[in-house]
Amino acid sequence: MPAVHFRHIDDFDWKEVIVQMHGDKRVTTQLKFLEMSPTRTVIYTHYDAGMTLEEHGHSSDHVLFILKGMVTIGEQECPPGMMVLLEHGATFGGPIVAGPEGCELIEFYTGDITPVPKDREAFHAMLDERGIKQVPVNF
């Protein structure tokens, strides 16, 4: 039966899902999974300053709402208050790079949240050019 659900962000633990080394600086992506079901997922996301993610899409619609800091997606700067709608099958149009203060955002998915990379080899070449090393994470 349909119901209303209330959840507070403080009731969820951060899960570190991506770690990069930018020189000697450790840079992370951390998530709080607020809701997960086959038809919807809601995630509170934190990117440390400089976090760099590959261009990718998802096998569902994906909505981002920027709360704090800034993120650049391809050439588009996304400040607080920006909503980004990535339709099922589309890609972001470039790498995703967190601004100098990092970024906090809410992500909504309407199905599968698995990233679909556009060009993994090009992404790794870009990381090498920038001196960024991916670090394996077990979560």
Question: Where are the language model's segments positioned?
Answer:
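Double-stranded beta-helix
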Residues: 93, 99-139
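Short strand-coil-strand connectors
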Residues: 37, 72-74, 99
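Glycine- and acidic-residue-biased ligand/ion/polar-headgroup-sensing regions
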Residues: 58-73
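Short glycine/proline-enriched turns and hinge-like loops at secondary-structure junctions
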Residues: 57-59, 76-78, 97-99
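Conserved short histidine dyad/triad with adjacent acidic residue
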Residues: 26-30, 37-57, 88-91
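A short, N-terminal "cap"/entry segment at the start of jelly-roll beta-barrel domains
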Residues: 1-39, 121-126, 132-139
